[in-house]
Amino acid sequence: MMPRARWLLLLAALVLSLAAAPVRAAAFLVPLGDTRVALDAPPGFADTGFLGSPRLEELAQSLTSASNRILLFAITDGDLRAFMNGDQPAMRRYMIAVTPRSLVRHSVSLDEFATLAADALRGLGKPAGSADYPKFLDRQPAGQASLLAELRSEPEVVSVLQGTRMPSQGGYGEKPHYLLSTTTWLLLRGKALSVSVYTGYDGPADLAWIKYVTQRWIDQLQRINSR
């Protein structure tokens, strides 16, 4: 992720560029080789691709590797309204869907997907040994995403929960700030996608929320791609 100061500058610049933009929220098809994959954001979120904002695209690019193609970057409806009204958005929750550029034109088999997911998991390390995630994250390097738990492991879905202790801003008596994220690898219509959900982590409600929304988004994407 980019430095917080740069992130805030980009957010401030977006206020002016999005102030007059219209709102649109609907499922859409993304051509990947000879296949079209259906995408949509969960209720309460809006895909931002239609805005055509270079600054917003830069924010999305900060969340993923340059080797991935961004298919969707969604923010909350409330944050989108804030942008368009010229107010400061919270940017506390957001989500992204990507696919490896090297696989855009390739039809991925179940065996290939299993290898891809296993390779991705192998680089995440071991999950936290307890459910006291703040305590676990306090022992990890600031700014580094750490594996907290494996959520699903199925032939076409592999999902994990991660957490990050955010770098200190240097304020006196500053409390630690945490970020939760889920990353899910999905096989949809022969295409390998990675979808991630992010939220600030202040307590159990945020943990419950991200697990629920992740599951709901997985189900939604599988449903609209089974037609």
Predicted regions and their residues:
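Bacterial N-terminal signal peptides
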Residues: 9-19
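Short aromatic-glycine motifs in intrinsically disordered, low-complexity regions
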Residues: 28-40
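Surface-exposed amphipathic alpha-helical segments
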Residues: 190-227
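Bacterial N-terminal signal peptides that target proteins for export
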Residues: 1-11
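Short conserved aromatic/hydrophobic patches within beta-strands of well-structured domains
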Residues: 37, 41-49
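Secretory pathway targeting signatures of secreted, lumenal, and periplasmic proteins
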Residues: 46-116, 123
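Sec/Tat signal peptide C-region and signal peptidase I cleavage site
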Residues: 21-25
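Signature of long, low-cysteine stretches enriched in small and polar/charged residues
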Residues: 112-184
